[in-house]
Amino acid sequence: MLISHPRIMIRHAPWVTSIETFCCSLATLFPKVFYTSVLTWSVYALIVHGCYDTLMTTQETSIFAIAIGLIGLTLYILCLYTYFKVLRAGPGSPSDFEELRIRNILSLSKPKYNSANPYDTNDNMATSASLLANAEGVDEIESIESEQPPSEYMTLHMLKSNNSSYRYCTKCSVWKPDRCHHCSTCNRCVLRMDHHCPWFAMCVGFYNHKFFAQFLMYLTAYSGFDFVVSLSILWKFFADEKYNDHYLSLNLVFLFVLSLAFFITVGGFSAFSLYLVFRNKTTIEFQENRWNFKNDKNGKSFQYEFDGSGKKKKLGNIFDLGCGRNWRSIMGPSWYYWLLPVTVTNKSIDARLENGINFEIDQDVYDRWCYNAQLQDQLNQQLADYKNRIRMEREANQTTDTNPF
């Protein structure tokens, strides 16, 4: 009779699972409720206490107050709409495409799995997944037909860092397109993953990246607008010494403080996000470049080349097509798409450059990456041969010393 530990039994009890699910739901719901509440309160403070109570004192200022109220209300609607547009669109995942799903993940663990990719220099590839196959009782793994990425739908340029095989996810059982990463929080792979945002309780990826950038821009503009309006009201209130016979609503004071804080923080993050858009780079790729830079200083990175004068320079980003093309590839082809939260993506498997599976690249930079990868492979092979030769010479010398005759 198998007796489980009490802690294990309690942890897997149905009521414990229900409590965990409820707590996760609350944690996911909190940022949405908090953001909506704060944003709605701000527009209330702006229109009611700022425009109606303070500015609508004479006929001349009434028109000005109405204009301020309409501008603030428009920015409020755009901020709220883009926020929920990010949630509704979602980041996108390879799991959404039947063609990218792997029928049998063990077929990729075959010792004779060959991949026809530009970096592949080895015919055979031993992986740890074959051990997993034996552990699960798959004795005849050679009889499993090896799967290959669907080349008719997906053109790959990024490979696994530890070998020359195409990237795939063992948790989601899908092929991973370029710039795709697995999110441990969402527990799924995300197309062109930028980052996981706690304020959305969701990842920012290919399908909602544009709306996320617009959300940051709208929120920065709205915060700056509230800050200017509340500052002017407070300045006039104290400059004209109205505090002697008038009361000032604390809502305007709180609006001034919060709008200033949001304008600085969100504005800084918005500037950083727009910089990445113009460079066609995700937050993950930006962070990877920082790690590579640190490794480069320690002599552990080879993502550079030497020019004619012998100076070292970086290879560059294969997805960087120039500021204009980078911007249009994410935000849309014209100013109409740039200003309004209009969808520019396509969730069809046949939409080559609009579904998050394929991306335009700088062919010249990509060729240099391939050439550099081949040189690295040759250097690694020469180093391995040298170490093997030294080891054999040492073993031969030891044999000679132990047997002089």
Swiss-Prot record:
Compartment(s) of residence: Vacuole membrane
Membrane association type: Multi-pass membrane protein
E.C. numbers: 2.3.1.225
Primary role: Palmitoyltransferase specific for VAC8. Palmitoylates VAC8 at one or more of its N-terminal cysteine residues, which is required for its proper membrane localization.
Catalytic activity annotation: L-cysteinyl-[protein] + hexadecanoyl-CoA = S-hexadecanoyl-L-cysteinyl-[protein] + CoA
PANTHER family: PALMITOYLTRANSFERASE ZDHHC16
Recorded family membership: Belongs to the DHHC palmitoyltransferase family. PFA3 subfamily.
Post-translational modification: Autopalmitoylated.
Lineage: Eukaryota, Fungi, Dikarya, Ascomycota, Saccharomycotina
Name assigned to this protein: Palmitoyltransferase PFA3
Organism in which the protein naturally occurs: Debaryomyces hansenii (strain ATCC 36239 / CBS 767 / BCRC 21394 / JCM 1990 / NBRC 0083 / IGC 2968)
Parts of the chain on the Cytoplasmic side: 1-27, 84-214, 273-405
Keyword presence, Transmembrane: yes
Record's keyword terms, sorted: Acyltransferase, Lipoprotein, Membrane, Palmitate, Transferase, Transmembrane, Transmembrane helix, Vacuole
